[in-house]
Amino acid sequence: MEFRTGDIDGVIWRPLKKYHDPRGWLCELFRHDELSAEFHPVMAYISMTEPGVARGPHEHIDQSDCFCFLGPSNFKVYLWDARKASPTHGARQTDVVGIDKPMLLVIPPGVVHAYKNVGAEQGIVFNCPNRLYKGWNRKGWIPGQGVDEIRHEDDAASRFQLD
């Protein structure tokens, strides 16, 4: 399948605002009154990615990710709409976010996603997904089935390629 460049239905791109004062800055990552209930986080984690390194591409069957890119580096985000019933099926979308463009990004199930640290220093990403990693008590998102993740990064012949 050949992907075409375009916006992807259901993906939320929300600029994050840093409020600066003499002490530093503060940024609200999410608020329940500004995020649809279907995307309300149930856990949160932070990851650090080395310069030039990518995470993904992968997708989820049931989980939506709510990523926050604030810096101190920049990331190129890659999205592919693999949902057959989606009005934007076959679309590919990219953008650079992070220190130069702080962004909250909600990615619904079935949208393949990856990000690559394109800056010169280590980059931090927050994720506040709407499902628990490995399910309740880490017993599997469907008991006995491990993690809700299809890892395309493990397939060298994957159609989801980063540039």
What does each model-identified segment do?
Residues 1-100, 118-163:
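Non-catalytic, conserved peripheral segments adjacent to functional cores
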